[in-house]
Amino acid sequence: MVPVIALVGRPNVGKSTLFNRLTKSRDAIVAEYAGLTRDRQYGEARWQGRTYIVIDTGGISGDEEGIDAKMAEQSLQAIEEADAVLFLVDSRAGMTAADQMIAEHLRKRNKRSFLIANKVDTIDPDLARAEFSPLGLGDALPIAAAHGRGINHMLQEALGIFPKDNAEEEGEGEPASEEVAEGEEPTRIPGPSEKDGIKIAIIGRPNVGKSTLVNRMLGEERVIVYDQAGTTRDSIYIPFERNEEMYTLIDTAGVRRRGKIFEAVEKFSVVKTLQAIQDANVVIFVMDAREGVVEHDLNLLGFVLETGRALVIALNKWDGMEAAERDYVKTELERRLLFVDFADIHFISALHGTGVGHLYKSVQESFRSAVTRWPTSRLTSILEDAVQVHQPPMVNGRRIKLRYAHLGGANPPLIVIHGNQVDAVPKAYTRYLEKTYRRVLKLVGTPIRIEYKGGENPYEGKKNSLTARQVNKKRRLMSHHKKAEKKKKDKRR
């Protein structure tokens, strides 16, 4: 399972800077989409081929009311459920009362914590270690988050406590290294996860109806094969069958057995939600139609997009809304969810079951789109047609040339395009190619990623050896050139 690391510390110690450094937020895929908020508190990060989740828990002021009063409930919960904590302190400011309170809280929870002394670019690291040694959390790891100093050593220590069994074993984001023979029909890339059917994570903000939807999907006319507790913080993996198709629901709210179902205020868990997204094949994102699109929805959708999961959106509590309210909500969806316009949107009532059955068709189509592979000839043909309709722009008087394309991975589909001057391809043209591939290949519910590779000169670095005749000719030319230069000098005298 993907490890979760929480960033903890008082305000202005550099947590956001470190978060951006680890998740590469400014360069993230999600930043290229209009309408998507970039102010996120959690994100996916990679280091030396390993994937992990980072959570910024927010600042802790540590006044007389104490840590529990000043930390938001979600921050405390994130610390409790995280696999490890990076506790940031400010080397320039020195140790404060707030630092001592946070350290005491972490010691009481017996949480695996790493003390991180930030802003050591102008401070002696040894002095910083000595300054914060009374906190009782071991030697501080010195870093300068703004400049990237010490980050590799910090990650080596923090990630070194986790086994190297990341998500690739689940068949996620797998490369499509086997070439499809020319003329073959597109095929699905099988993965170990298919044994229990399509894994579906139902996520969303608190009290949007996730529990009701889970109960509805596991309700009448469904056969629950068995209930099995997952290994990650009480998340439940529930395989079930519908119309002779196998599915596995990843339920972050716990099992609700028949006869014991009751509605209660959900305790939202960021950690469970993010890990459910990572482990799923398809995400059903539940929103409250009466509240419309809120910032928290955009944050979670941004993480889904960043991880590349197939996506289906369900607008719950649609029944009972007036026609004018429905029209307004649809307008807001079109305006604010442009960055996930590939996802099917369903208007449902989980309580009454209206529209719930249609979710399965979208789940199957999204999964099929995410794991299908196509031959190079097919992808190249689509590229050539797209270039013929709309050519890439000119750069320094030369037009960008896109030569051929092949599949570089699946779930989500990764299309690798080779050509010249590919570093100068505008984002708008990349979006044009994405839409073209989506339309021609009839892809639904999955993001597409396009990667460019520049053409390599086959003669670069190679040097032909001269023949004996060429060597003699070169010598004669050099001798003739020297004699001519000598005559010119003699005439000047």
UniProtKB/Swiss-Prot annotation:
Basic and acidic residues compositional bias, start-end: 454-463
Chain intervals with Acidic residues compositional bias: 167-184
GO MF term (any one): ribosome binding
Listed Pfam families: KH_dom-like (PF14714), MMR_HSR1 (PF01926)
Entry keyword annotation includes Nucleotide-binding: yes
Entry-linked Gene3D superfamilies: 3.30.300.20, P-loop containing nucleotide triphosphate hydrolases (3.40.50.300)
UniProt keyword GTP-binding, yes or no: yes
UniProt xrefs under SUPFAM superfamilies: P-loop containing nucleoside triphosphate hydrolases (SSF52540)
Chain sites annotated for binding GTP 2: 204-211, 251-255, 316-319
Function: GTPase that plays an essential role in the late steps of ribosome biogenesis.
NCBIfam families, alphabetized: GTPase_EngA (TIGR03594), small_GTP (TIGR00231)
Protein name: GTPase Der
Taxonomic lineage: Bacteria, Pseudomonadati, Pseudomonadota, Gammaproteobacteria, Pseudomonadales
Originating gene: der
